[in-house]
Amino acid sequence: MAYKEVTRDELSAAGVQYGHQTKRWNPKMAPFIYGSKSKNHVIDLEKTLIQLRQAEKLVQSIGAKGEKVLFVGTRRSAKLAVKEAALRSGNYYVNQRWLGGTLTNFKTIVKRIKALWEIEESEKNGQLALRTKKEQILILKEKANLEKSLGGIKQMRKLPAALIVVDPKSDEIAVKEAIKLNIPVIGLCDTNVDPDIVTLPIPANDDLQESVNIMINALVDAFADGANLKLAPSVLKTVVVKRERTEGENNYSNNRSWNKPERTNN
């Protein structure tokens, strides 16, 4: 590959290895867990790299074919990453609430996208200014709502070749729609997620923005390599700044022993 592959040390610096509390785990994630510390699971970064490399090959091939991917991340930790990734690489994104039927009822979604295009065109050609003030307010309000829910996919004229989803558990509806249509799904799976619901799971922390950023950036770089694109550099942080943890956050003290999880046979 021509692009620079992310390393294990870089993943570690981004906090990719930090899983959820052991009591909140999904046993199907056992093959991807290194152990536990301070009552939190720790993800095996070697397994993360293996899965990431497979995902990179997939998105690289999609880029080489001139096709597009849809980034999905509606959680706070993912909103900026998926938007920046799509804008940098000419792909699509959803970072607000997933609209049911976005994929499975795409014809209806296209009609709503066209409504957004028409409003934008009326602004450009001056037709909107000819309407009454009341009508303009209502139309612009509709535009704002459409832009919020469809802005990231308003250039999507056909179904994407793949979905890249941050936290498939939170955006399970999007995952189910894609799987129903045989669209492959790459999912960043924390230790509380069922990895079987996606086509290609990548074990990774989905709460830290730095973790999400570095994983999404790695996939964008692979896509750009396949599509022969020169990307503008990402402005998002990929290194966790050490600070005092607030109550309820994952805490990994250095004086605790490591415990291996019970592995399943699955």
Swiss-Prot record:
GO cellular component, one term: small ribosomal subunit
CDD domains linked to this entry: RPS2
InterPro entries associated with the record: Ribosomal_uS2, Ribosomal_uS2_bac/mit/plastid, Ribosomal_uS2_CS, Ribosomal_uS2_flav_dom_sf
Residue span of region Disordered: 247-266
Family matches, as Pfam families: Ribosomal_S2 (PF00318)
Gene Ontology terms for molecular function: structural constituent of ribosome
Transmembrane segments: none
UniProt-recorded name of the protein: Small ribosomal subunit protein uS2
GO biological process: translation
Biased composition regions of type Polar residues, renumbered to the chain: 249-258
Keywords: Ribonucleoprotein, Ribosomal protein
Family: Belongs to the universal ribosomal protein uS2 family.
